[in-house]
Amino acid sequence: TMQVETDDFAAQCAQAFRNVVAVLGAAGASGEHLVRLTWYITSRDEYSASLRDVGRSYRDIVGRHFPAMAVVIVAGLVEPRAKVEIEAMAVVPD
């Protein structure tokens, strides 16, 4: 089971990036194969306040590949402590 280990928005984003990269790696892919990211966030204010740290961890973990992205503000996520969930779509060549 996946548990949220921190209430820090930027740290939750970094963990989400590590999770995405791990799944990509299991498929023989990397960040360059990402074509779309949809972020579900619970707080516009925390997102805005954390942009610099989130951007830095994205580049460090995923790389300097920037697919199409959308950010959706939601009332809540399944895990009560979660502040961000990232849905990723990748295209991996045969």
What does each model-identified segment do?
Residues T1-D94:
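Short, polar/acidic, helix-capping and beta-turn segments at strand->helix junctions
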